[in-house]
Each structure stands twice: as structure tokens, then as C-alpha cells.
Design a protein with these regions (language model features):
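N-terminal targeting sequences that direct proteins away from the cytosol to non-cytosolic compartments
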Residues: 2-12, 16-102, 140, 158-160, ...
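Short, solvent-exposed aromatic-acidic interface loops
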Residues: 111-114, 129, 181-185
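Surface-exposed aromatic
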Residues: 105-107, 148, 176-177
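A short acidic-to-branched-hydrophobic micro-motif
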Residues: 90-121
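Signature of long, low-cysteine stretches enriched in small and polar/charged residues
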Residues: 80-82, 113, 119-171
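Surface-exposed flexible segments
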Residues: 109-111, 119-126, 191-199
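Residue-level recognition of well-ordered beta-strand positions that form the cores
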Residues: 109, 151-153, 179-181
């Protein structure tokens, strides 16, 4: 993994990407799934760093994403058998979280999905497999991709109610699923950070 300081070009690209919500979402989505320029240029530069990852040691899966300053980040553990069965369930790629925290974090997964299956159907399946309830939903037009963006409520045996903001989009036969989650009582505090991080996710592999 390589880490570099966020530069002005990246700051502006993130702000630009966040501003492209398609249509006018209903008020609940606006409140719970914020988009747009949520931080100033100075706040972005101080509060986030651009990290580069190469999951599975495969350049085809290389990606860039903003990670909040001070958070721990690493490639996800996975079973090699998951890669050969990536049409059956999502495969973990990366994850990060505040130092020492176990009640919030961000992760990215991928799943190989036939081109004739819409991402919205993948989202529905993902929520069902997590025993989740979709509380708010919208579609975003971000540069080079259309994104299914939704807030899912789940229950963790140890943590209780959890809110998960999920953005999913397609690149070829790959659907990327980026999730930012927290215990319900912390979601309001972190929702702008989650929005900025998820919108910054950029697969760079070819």
C-alpha cells in the first residue's frame, strides 16, 4: 500500500464528484445520505489522505480512496477460494476504521455479476443477505459511473442497531460495494465523513 498527501486536484475532484446527485431525492434521503461539498478545501486537506491499495496483489483491482487522518487501514483478509467463487458472494478488499474503534468503519468488497443484471438487483440481494432494511435510497451520477446509494439498517449481536451507508456501481462484470457503517447513535456524527470517503472511491486497475 502506498500513501500520499491529498493534493488540490484530488480535493477538487472529490468535491466535484460529490455534487452530482441525479434528480432531487426525497427529504429523508437528503438528510440521511448527504452529498455535495461537505468539507472545505482546507478541511479535506487536513482531515483526509489519499491511499492507494492493490488487493489480492492484482493490479486489476488497484484503487484509490480517501482515508480519514489517523484511521488504521489495511487490505482485508480473505480465503483464496473466495476469488474463484466471486460470482456467489462479495469478496472483501480493504477496510479502515479509527484507531481502536470497533463500532464504526469502512470496507470495500467486489462481486462478479453478469452484465445483464442491474446493480439495483445486486443491492437488493446484498441487503437481504445482511438481514438489512433499506431506510433511504437514491441514485447518483458520479464521473464515469452511476451509483446505487442507500442507507441500510442492520442489527449486530454485540453492538445493537447499526446504520450502513452503501454505494455500489459496476465496472464491466465487476460490481464494487463500498460500505461505511457505525452504531446507530454515531451515524449523525460521521455521516459527512462517510459520504466523502465513499464518493472518493476510485478503481484504477485496468
Amino acid at each position: 500500500m502506498k500513501t500520499k498527501l491529498v493534493n488540490l486536484a484530488l480535493v477538487w475532484s472529490v468535491a466535484f464528484a460529490c455534487s452530482f446527485a441525479s434528480g432531487f431525492p426525497q427529504q429523508p434521503a437528503q438528510n440521511q445520505l448527504p452529498t455535495g461539498s461537505l468539507f472545505s478545501t482546507e478541511e479535506l486537506a487536513k482531515g483526509f489522505g489519499s491511499h492507494q491499495f492493490t488487493p489480492f496483489g492484482d493490479p486489476k483491482f488497484s484503487l484509490d480512496i480517501l482515508v480519514p487522518t489517523g484511521w488504521e487501514s489495511h487490505l482485508s483478509d480473505y480465503d483464496p477460494g473466495q476469488l474463484s467463487h466471486d460470482t456467489e458472494s462479495p469478496v472483501p478488499m480493504i477496510e479502515f476504521y479509527p484507531n481502536g474503534a470497533d463500532d464504526l468503519g469502512v470496507n470495500v468488497q467486489y462481486m462478479r455479476v453478469p452484465g445483464d443484471k442491474p446493480v439495483s438487483a445486486v443491492v437488493d440481494m446484498y441487503a437481504k443477505s445482511a438481514n438489512g432494511t433499506i431506510a433511504a435510497r437514491q441514485q447518483l451520477d458520479l464521473p464515469e459511473r452511476k451509483v446505487e446509494d442507500f442507507l441500510m439498517k442492520t442489527t449486530d449481536d454485540s453492538l445493537g442497531p447499526v446504520l450502513n451507508r452503501v454505494m455500489a456501481f459496476r465496472r464491466g462484470d465487476i460490481v464494487f460495494i463500498a460500505t461505511a457503517w457505525s452504531v446507530e447513535e454515531k451515524y449523525e456524527q460521521y455521516k459527512k465523513i462517510f459520504a466523502t470517503v465513499l464518493a472518493s472511491f476510485n478503481p484504477t486497475g485496468k
